[in-house]
């Protein structure tokens, strides 16, 4: 039977509960345990799919097509276990399910209340389908005291009494601020946070204390005394230069040992952290550097590109180099020459996005990369803009554009239900590749034998990658574009959907309709990112 670890946060938001959960999951996994990580989000949205990147950051897409919180990306990257739609739930989803049942009459006329109906639904989600795991780590979004989080805290309070004694522990992540004028760390915010937690019936077993310096013994003693935890359960979570240093740092601080002790489990030797040691050695001692320009629409909110940043880092780890990122707002290139911004970079990456804003700037970035032989990686929207650039400037299709931006005579890119066959509007069925207006989750792609991308993947002819897009490149223009060197080297197995394009004769120019960053791991870098950074190294004359 699975044991449950609930991770809560206090004092301030953005302390890194997701990272702490992922690092602890990696430590338990390194000890031979099977772990599952889940996230409870208290917001009323059904999922983050329609939320602004500036509000929420990245939408992480799972193999089964769920649009989830970016913390699930941390879970996957640290444990290697693919997340599913069953690993993330929101208040909105809980209420939708309850109200659907109420309309059907499932509650037999009962008055629907937060307790017990909402809390029971949360508990059912938490304990569902966990028999195959030794530990289930459950992160509660937000901080203690947030009004929208109260049903979740009540549910995890109840669940300790529902399950056998000793099967549940609580870890509280908190902040120990340093006050320079006083010359000391302050424990009072943590004491008040724990007091708030205890007022709703939850006594933390372990305090995970974010700090920028070592915690003195006297402060540890004070936290243990006033927060009612053992002094050994006050764990120091020092700021780290790299997130991939966190598992080893938490182990050195004794977190995994303390978790096992809280469950009454005897520790059997040291966890196998060799792969983390290798990763951190490469991060700390790179053999060179490359600079990659990310030409995007949401560069003011770096979390909107969280998986992308990490995947570039993984490419650097694979090639033993440090990857520096130049953030460039794509709208800049609509009024200015891109050369001063891009001449010094070793690679250009144009990521996904929605809407017309900044699109022409991304097209200019693709043109610069093509003309100057700079490695170019276009992802989703970035591939579409590269195709439009080729159509306009190589194939002579001056009006080439995307129907996402309005009506156009030359729809190089269109909504996946808009394609014309002859003069007739073609409607796709839900059973086909183009069901609905959003293509979500893992789909296969057939690679052209002998293509660069096939070689990058290890000479395979079929791959599976995750998608999140409404618009697609129009295959009606395929032959005209290929005549000018833009090769369609990957298609859906039925040949309907373009998945990958590449230029023949260019050092490295690849566009993909999918999101490879979602499947990259520090210990298993995605081959496209490893190859892209390798090409950037060649461009910088490092190799």
UniProtKB/Swiss-Prot annotation:
GO biological process, one term: 'de novo' CTP biosynthetic process
Residues that coordinate or bind Mg(2+): 71, 139
GO molecular function, one term: CTP synthase activity
The keyword Nucleotide-binding is annotated on this UniProt entry: yes
Active site residues per record: 380 (nucleophile), 515, 517
Keywords: ATP-binding, Glutamine amidotransferase, Ligase, Magnesium, Metal-binding, Nucleotide-binding, Pyrimidine biosynthesis
Binding site for UTP: 13, 186-191, 222
PROSITE patterns (UniProt xref): GATASE_TYPE_1 (PS51273)
Top-tier EC class: ligase
Reaction equation(s) it catalyzes: UTP + L-glutamine + ATP + H2O = CTP + L-glutamate + ADP + phosphate + 2 H(+); L-glutamine + H2O = L-glutamate + NH4(+); UTP + NH4(+) + ATP = CTP + ADP + phosphate + 2 H(+)
Listed InterPro entries: Class_I_gatase-like (IPR029062), CTP_synthase (IPR004468), CTP_synthase_N (IPR017456), GATASE (IPR017926), GATase1_CTP_Synthase (IPR033828), P-loop_NTPase (IPR027417)
Activity modulation: Allosterically activated by GTP, when glutamine is the substrate; GTP has no effect on the reaction when ammonia is the substrate. The allosteric effector GTP functions by stabilizing the protein conformation that binds the tetrahedral intermediate(s) formed during glutamine hydrolysis. Inhibited by the product CTP, via allosteric rather than competitive inhibition.
Biological or metabolic pathway of the protein: Pyrimidine metabolism; CTP biosynthesis via de novo pathway; CTP from UDP: step 2/2
E.C. number: 6.3.4.2
GO cellular component: cytosol
Protein origin, superkingdom: Bacteria
Keyword Lipid biosynthesis: no
Residues the record lists as binding L-glutamine: 54, 353, 381-384, 404, 470
Ligand binding (CTP): 13, 146-148, 186-191, 222
Residues covered by the Glutamine amidotransferase type-1 domain: 291-542
Family named by the database record: Belongs to the CTP synthase family.
Record-linked NCBIfam families: PRK05380.1 (NF003792), PyrG (TIGR00337)
Its job: Catalyzes the ATP-dependent amination of UTP to CTP with either L-glutamine or ammonia as the source of nitrogen. Regulates intracellular CTP levels through interactions with the four ribonucleotide triphosphates.
Miscellaneous note of the record: CTPSs have evolved a hybrid strategy for distinguishing between UTP and CTP. The overlapping regions of the product feedback inhibitory and substrate sites recognize a common feature in both compounds, the triphosphate moiety. To differentiate isosteric substrate and product pyrimidine rings, an additional pocket far from the expected kinase/ligase catalytic site, specifically recognizes the cytosine and ribose portions of the product inhibitor.
Name of the molecule in the record: CTP synthase
